[in-house]
Amino acid sequence: SALYLLSAKRYGVPVRICHSHLSGADRGLCVELLCKLLKPILNKVTTDMFACGRDAAISLWGKENVLNQRVYILNNAIDTAQFSYSESIRKQKRAELGLGTETVYGTVGRMSYQKNSEFIVQIYNQIRNHKKNCKFLFVGVGEREESVKELAKEYGLSDMLFLESRNDVNQLMMAMDVFLLPSRFEGLPIVLVEAQCAGLTCFVSDAVTKEIHVNPNVYYYGLDKGPDEWARFIIDHENSEFDRKDGMDSIVKAGYQIATEAKKLENYYMRAVEKKCI
């Protein structure tokens, strides 16, 4: 967006917003170098600094701007009603997928280096070594798809269902019991907001910001641990007493309701335009 903001400043556009989505943790050398080059430019041409969370704000705008409250944090909000847990939808979707009473693990996201997709397969393979009555729903496509499917085939994971891109992610989350997100890096992953709204027990890497930790059944674990250690940790902590029906209320109270955030953003735009255009 740096080029667009430069042009906007050149032609006298009074309100110029730039939104940071990624934190600086482990995002790769090329991206890191690009960000370092663009930071001073963006700080000069941006009138209103936005970010999806505190870590993403510090990464692009710097700690001083965050401490001085110059950065507007706009939560990655969702339509919470769509992800509110429903026992009837769960039963219907599980029947549709041929699932019974087994523990259903799952993930949603691009099959990519960032999402650590092959590692997810390795974790589930280890889970299967300790536990037989289970299945895995892998929702998403991406550049690592062939590699991921080959690895699952190599391990003989016929119970790992690849569902590709779907428009019923909310219902699939209700069919799941456990959600995995061992990403190498993230900004503030909206999929984890959705998973918590659906009341899922979640296991995420320590590269994911704890700003998004809302429900008590969300567990962080280190990327320095191997797949067997992850599998044992998951099995030891997956049986949560958290009532999945409370997921939506928790997410709404934490500020991730789309209607509320959209209204806040609308009000911000109106104030910014009035302040700088009058």
Model-derived segments and spans:
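Short hydrophobic beta-strand element within catalytic cores of glycosyltransferases
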Residues: T201-S205, K210
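Aromatic "clamp/platform" in nucleotide-sugar-dependent glycosyltransferases that forms part
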Residues: S165, R184
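A short, histidine- and acid-enriched strand-loop-helix "catalytic/donor-clamping" loop
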Residues: A2, Y11-V31, T47-D48
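A charged, aromatic-enriched C-terminal amphipathic alpha-helix characteristic of glycosyltransferases
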Residues: E241-I278
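A short helix/loop element that forms part of the nucleotide-sugar donor recognition site in Leloir-type
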Residues: S84-G98, S240
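A conserved mid-protein helix/loop that constitutes part of the nucleotide-sugar donor-binding site
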Residues: T103, T107-Q126, E143-K149
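Donor nucleotide-sugar binding/catalytic pocket of nucleotide-sugar-dependent glycosyltransferases
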Residues: K44-S88, Y220
